[in-house]
């Protein structure tokens, strides 16, 4: 077992690795205590997107998404799950990815929070971790945005 950036990698067999990625979000949503006000579906989408891109970047195939939602299922949790489903639509793998998770039904909450963990598998022969070398040209497009900056573009 080892870590690479935000990933945890576990050798399952001599040919197969399990890759685990995760991300979280807090204080962003439509609840009274949220600092950034957006539809919870947006949180589900972007939090899933971040963890999914980290997993796919090394060549892993996602098999399971585990959401830990610090909100009630009806209706905030369901909106977040809608965003999770929207994030995986472009992969055309929805039937191959098991989505499971948990919500907070015991305590009323006044702030939106969620965590996401994605588990994937990769054949060791297809493992790809590349590092930039002196001869590489690295191009970055766009402007980094966070919180309200991103919400304004929605």
Region annotations inferred by a language model:
Residues 1-154:
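Helix-biased detector of long, well-ordered alpha-helical tracts
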């Amino acid at each position: 077992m080892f870590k690479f950036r935000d990933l945890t990698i576990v050798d399952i067999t001599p040919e197969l690795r399990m890759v685990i990625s995760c991300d979280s979000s807090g204080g962003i949503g439509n609840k009274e205590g949220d600092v950034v006000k957006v539809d919870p579906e947006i949180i589900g989408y972007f939090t899933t997107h971040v963890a999914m891109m980290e997993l796919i970047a090394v060549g892993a195939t996602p098999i399971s998404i585990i959401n830990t939602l610090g909100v009630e299922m009806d209706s905030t949790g369901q909106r977040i799950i809608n965003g999770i489903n929207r994030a995986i639509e472009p992969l055309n793998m929805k039937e191959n990815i098991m989505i499971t998770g948990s919500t907070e039904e015991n305590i009323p909450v006044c702030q939106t929070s969620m965590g996401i963990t994605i588990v994937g598998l990769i054949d060791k022969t297809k493992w790809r971790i590349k590092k930039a070398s002196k001869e590489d040209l690295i191009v970055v497009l766009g402007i980094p945005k966070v919180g309200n900056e991103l919400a304004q573009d929605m």
